[in-house]
């Protein structure tokens, strides 16, 4: 009886671990049909993480998808591995804080978005990190 309980717990843990890890797919295995992203040859809209890579093998981009649309954090990288940009998406639209970086890693700009339109504070920076400009946006 004790062995059955232990076996049940192990099976439960393995199932839970497989559910909690998002599916990761290379962008070369993807296709877009009618604005929805799918793994080639599959009929269900993709949920998970799509990644693309530079020819040198370094990560170029990674984006979270839910039901075939960008949802959550998306990042793009320079070929040297430094972060180029990051932003949050909801149903394929930028929402929340978006950041763009210079290749040296310093912040280039910060924008806030609502439904893919600038909304709120914008800050632009020189490559040395000094503030260049600041503005407020309403409805894009």
Segments (PLM) and residue ranges:
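Bacterial N-terminal signal peptides that target proteins for export
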Residues: 1-8
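Acidic, gly/ser/pro-rich intrinsically disordered tails
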Residues: 10-12
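Glycine/tyrosine- and acidic-biased, solvent-exposed loop/turn segments at the edges of beta-strands
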Residues: 14-140
